[in-house]
């Protein structure tokens, strides 16, 4: 029997990551089922909560109920935690608790962390993880502070929560929003003319979207692009192409009104994010396909 136990196959890093994500999704779905999670105080069907939790952890932004009007503040907080966990990665979140508690991180845990964030080597993985956590929370905090003037003007004290939620959601590229409290599934249509807010959200999405390893290269080598890793160069070049080309299409074929400045910002915004400044039925069929 002891020999069988010794020969028992250990769970690989990828299995731990997969089971970790599945566990977080299932836990989130169960919590969202509770009456306290919905604004109406009712039990939400499991299929809806499972879809919402999966969408939040996988940061897809797809929803079956309007986030702002259907879920209570508690439910929205659960969704935000799921988004943050999905954006950082389950293993990174778990590792952060170990660091805060002062526990030593084993070699096996370091290897799992390496796989979780696709780091090139195990060496320096703890330092890289700290950089990721500090960078994430700092940028999200700055984003929330910059949004405060807009949302506190429109929502009062609730504007603080609106700022935090949308900063985290944008940085994690989640696509979730709370603007349904004005009109269900309205997204950013009520703020289509607020260029200041559009730019902040767009910059948060781009900053979060390029990835942790690119941050590391930028932080280490600054403007010396030649020293960037091949992965960072590919990510930056591909991101630029995928942002600029669709933006040019939107600019010339969709927006035939407004100033050049407004058209430029709106085109870039629609290229960067799935959040909508216009109702989805308004663009042409060609734009919806692109």
Q: Which stretches of residues belong to each language-model region?
A:
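Membrane-proximal intracellular helices of multi-pass ion channels
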Residues: 1-289
